């Protein structure tokens, strides 16, 4: 878990004992293992040099395509800021597997989440507060919902007639599914996981990305490395496969494409006219959100709702910009 938001950090610490944990991701590229995000070690290892920070900056300037003044997509963004070689090695194949699209079909903003560091810092996240729940996220969520005012019903899908049972509904399901996909299905990605059992260590780290398009999975997670305070001889790993989300699959994250915005805008326009309902979360607002942002927006939404009750104002269908 990682965030710069102290309010969010305090919130999760109310429900879980957060242990110190720094996520350090490795990547297998052409038979070699590199550190991510791209840092000084990655640059020196990849190009077979021993650059200082200033030398590495100059090297990347030589590699970058500075003729691209205003990148219009992911690929152009990468070519302008890291150059063709690093883009081809670390991002092109991985991006195609993760999104099911060529990088030229994705917005440039997707790559802005991935930094390049001119030092040897291999902390994947550059956030003030970082940790992991000692007893896992399941325990944390269980602690959140164990409240006298909360009733959890499993294996029950939302139905429109349920709205009459409540003064206000907060809907975190898929936006198009709320309307039974009347205008067509929005695009999502889903994930498949293949378990690997090993009697020893499997890869020696928590996360190993596989950047080549020739390898069908995007990464392997070795779970005992997420809890280094525990001791395990054997190991459980999961290969992660990303694919298009079909109607009966669990949607993991939305794919916002510039050429599909007309369909999304139909749903957003209709949703904004709704009364007594607020759409929230990754699926409800159709945005790719990290966990800390999702929690921050949920807390903000709760505050807006309480204020609307106090001031007897109408609660909006969205409390964030969509």
Question: Each predicted region: which residue ranges?
Answer:
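Conserved beta-strand segments of alpha/beta enzyme cores
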Residues: 17, 149-153, 276
């Amino acid at each position: 878990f990682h965030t710069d938001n102290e309010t969010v950090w305090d919130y999760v610490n109310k429900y879980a004992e957060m242990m110190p944990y720094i996520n350090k991701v490795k990547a297998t590229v052409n038979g070699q293992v590199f550190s991510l995000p791209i840092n000084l070690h990655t640059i020196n290892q990849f190009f077979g040099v021993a650059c200082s920070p200033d030398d590495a900056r100059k090297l990347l300037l030589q590699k970058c395509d500075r003729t691209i003044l205003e990148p219009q997509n992911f690929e152009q963004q990468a070519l302008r800021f890291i150059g063709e070689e690093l883009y081809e090695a670390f991002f092109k194949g991985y991006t195609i597997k993760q999104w099911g699209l060529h990088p030229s079909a994705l917005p440039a903003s997707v790559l802005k989440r991935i930094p390049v560091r001119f030092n040897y810092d291999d902390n994947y996240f550059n956030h003030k507060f970082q940790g992991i729940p000692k007893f896992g996220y399941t325990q944390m969520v269980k602690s959140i919902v164990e409240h006298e005012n909360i009733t959890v019903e499993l294996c029950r899908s939302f139905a429109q007639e349920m709205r009459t049972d409540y003064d206000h509904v907060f809907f975190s399901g898929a936006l198009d599914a709320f309307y039974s996909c009347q205008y067509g299905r929005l695009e999502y990605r889903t994930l498949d996981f293949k378990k690997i059992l090993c009697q020893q260590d499997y890869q020696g780290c928590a996360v190993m990305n596989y950047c080549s398009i020739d390898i069908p999975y995007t990464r392997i997670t070795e779970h005992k490395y997420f809890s280094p305070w525990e001791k395990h001889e054997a190991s459980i790993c999961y290969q992660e496969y990303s694919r298009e989300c079909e109607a009966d699959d669990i949607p993991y994250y939305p794919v916002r494409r510039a050429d599909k915005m007309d369909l999304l805008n139909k749903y957003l326009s209709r949703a904004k006219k709704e009364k007594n309902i607020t759409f929230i979360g990754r699926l409800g607002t159709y945005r790719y959100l990290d966990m800390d942002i999702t929690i921050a927006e949920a807390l903000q939404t709760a505050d807006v709702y309480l204020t609307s009750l106090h001031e007897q104002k109408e609660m909006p269908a969205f409390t964030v910009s969509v």
